[in-house]
A protein has these predicted regions:
Chain A
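Amphipathic alpha-helical interaction surfaces in cytosolic regulatory modules
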Residues: 21-91
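Short acidic-hydrophobic, aromatic-tinged amphipathic segments that line or gate anion-handling sites
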Residues: 93-95
């Protein structure tokens, strides 16, 4: 499940449960927006797959690789292990 | 034979036997010590070879300054595997998004097709009305009747074409849906296995490091023990000399027991009390070299 809060400057994406290919359509719509900062809240996410990493990389491309403009919040458990192993902690601001 | 003479002869024989036994003991000891020395020397060499081989193997596994080693290669393979999975995931997500866009466009075109079909249907109705009107006005409406028939024919063709396009779009839409499902499978690779493998690799490296430290410690201790044994075996010379000295002193006793030796007792006593070896243990001591 995905919930989006948009205050123009910051778009907060709150995900719940599994972060996988089922939210690709939502992300496609989100990628048309141009906020200053993206915040992806993963505190309620307990699983990510390779498509989730792909979506995060597309968000990063959207801000031309500026790590400060994509923040990953509440990263824990399996998502943290996967993100760290894929070296995403060097590409994103992990909180 | 008188009693002192018998005793002297017996003591002389006994001493000769003891001296002979001591000679055998010295010979056996020398032989045994020599073999032990050879064995421990070979053991020390083999230990050195073993340790060198072990250290080379460890370097092959853990790597050195210029070489990443087996562990490095495994980490690199795992890292590349994860990179590839992420790359495939990203590309698949892009493809899925493109497919979704195409499906959206297809739906829009299908709606336009339905609109065209509706226009064709309306046109058919209009041509029918025109034909009825042309019929009603008789011969004067003959030309309009022909035009109305042509319009009806065009409307039919247009409707048929729109239906064909709509059917083709339905096939395309189904095909895009299948593509989307297939790409979704490609996009969603489970990375848990890679995470587990990485953890196992870390655990194995830690175990290997602990085992290496323990093995190197055992090697060092065995080497120290071997060195100590070799050092102890080097006291064989001292022991041989001591046994030789005992034999010599017994010979002096034999000489002292013989007739006419009473005048030489002072000299014999001096020789008896001369120690060639001052050592009482395997620690520091002196050996009188002959």
């Amino acid at each position: 499940m995905i919930q989006v809060t948009d205050n123009h400057d910051v778009v907060t994406i709150q995900l719940t449960g599994r972060f996988d290919f089922r939210v690709i359509k939502d992300f496609q719509e989100l990628l048309t927006r141009e906020p200053r900062t993206w915040v992806v809240d993963l505190s309620a996410v307990d699983y990510v797959d390779s498509s989730a990493l792909g979506m995060l990389l597309l968000l990063r491309d959207r801000v031309r690789g500026d790590a400060q403009r994509v923040q990953l919040r509440g990263v824990h458990g399996q998502p943290r292990e996967v993100l760290v192993m894929a070296k995403f902690d060097r590409m994103f601001k992990l909180e | 034979m008188d009693e002192p003479g018998t005793l002297t002869a017996w003591i002389d024989t006994a001493l000769a036997k003891i001296i002979s036994d001591l000679g055998r003991a010295r010979s056996l000891l020398k032989d045994a010590m020599s073999r032990l020395l050879e064995t421990f020397t070979r053991l020390r060499e083999q230990l050195l070879q073993e340790r060198t081989l072990y250290e080379v193997t460890l370097q092959e596994v853990n790597g050195t300054a210029g070489d990443v080693g087996l562990v490095g290669v495994l980490r690199d393979v795992l890292s590349r595997c994860v990179d590839d999975m992420v790359r495939i995931g990203t590309s698949s997500v892009k493809i899925m998004m493109e497919v979704e866009s195409l499906r959206g466009h297809t739906s829009k075109v299908a709606v336009r097709g339905q609109q065209i079909e509706k226009i064709a249907s309306t046109t058919r109705m209009l041509s029918l009305n025109a034909r009825i009107e042309a019929q009603r006005i008789g011969n004067a409406g003959a030309v309009f009747r022909v035009v109305a028939d042509e319009i009806k024919s065009l409307a039919n063709e247009s409707g048929e074409l729109s239906r064909a396009i709509r059917e083709a779009l339905a096939v395309q839409s189904a095909s895009l849906a299948q593509t989307s499902t297939a790409v979704a499978k490609l996009a969603s690779s489970d990375l848990d296995h890679a995470v587990t493998s990485n953890k196992k690799l870390d655990e194995t490296i830690a175990k290997l490091a602990a085992m290496s430290a323990r093995s190197l410690d055992i090697f060092a201790r065995v080497q120290a023990e071997t060195a100590s044994a070799l050092q102890a075996l080097q006291f064989e010379d001292m022991l041989t000399q001591l046994l030789q000295s005992i034999s010599d002193k017994l010979e002096i006793v034999r000489t002292a027991c013989k007739a006419g030796a009473i005048d030489k007792l002072a000299e014999l006593d001096r020789r008896i009390h001369r120690d060639v070896v001052t050592q009482h243990s395997l620690g520091v001591g002196t050996v009188e070299l002959f």
